[in-house]
């Protein structure tokens, strides 16, 4: 029998501050350009000696992870699984600049060592004393969902009982400029940001449980015409139909190519309430982790914060109970992912 998987704790460092009960009541839409995270006092959760050696992304990740474990009343973890689009890109920039400035000679290895994509997961293992399964996924816009799928499969199969799942990406000046010049990001259209979101997943339900993570699906390429079949097949796997979805968590950005997919999904599920999260999180490779946190919050509280509505003036009648929520993410017409949550 497949085990159920619950989100027992959430932690985050975002442009809206840290994860907290009032995060959505205090949230404001980000402005165009670069939106760095609202950094907390890291010493509240991370020892000072360890903190001094951490880069921005590692600090955000470790803080969010500790926060998620505290929320779940969990002190130890069996496994750590993370996703990141660009890894510790600040240190990557630093190392490449040193190569250029020193004509590829007399380089110290520190920045290179700290720039690897699995640095956050490795630092968490040291911080938490976890000697178990440790994996980092780097798959562009589906990096977090790839990590999520790994965690879900292992928990459902009974290979693990508890997993620390997370995602982190940071803003690096040089990398940001490269992405802008390549047309990958358009800060004049939508804010480019950073953040870390972590989740304590377990097969045991607790009082702190926010929602049940039911299923995850990934597909590299789709047309808007293929989207309906992609979604219906995904739901059918769980014995569900499109009419069973109470809400959609979407990633509108103002980019015509991206938004066409989200608009198409709204047409496929016209009865589901359309919600959005990117005006609060900003755009970065693993921002969908914030969308998952927002979706879990809704199912836990049985209330949709006004700031999450796609169109507050056209919101639909509230269901008797928010039961199923579907999170859909893609970027540039590629890396399409679906995450299904159920109230617990």
Task: Give residue spans per PLM region.
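Short-chain dehydrogenase/reductase
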Residues: 148
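Alpha-to-beta junction loops
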Residues: 159-161
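Conserved "HGTGT" condensation-loop signature of ketosynthase/thiolase-family condensing enzymes
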Residues: 1-133, 145, 153-157, 168-344
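Short catalytic-loop micro-motif centered on adjacent basic/acidic residues
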Residues: 134-138
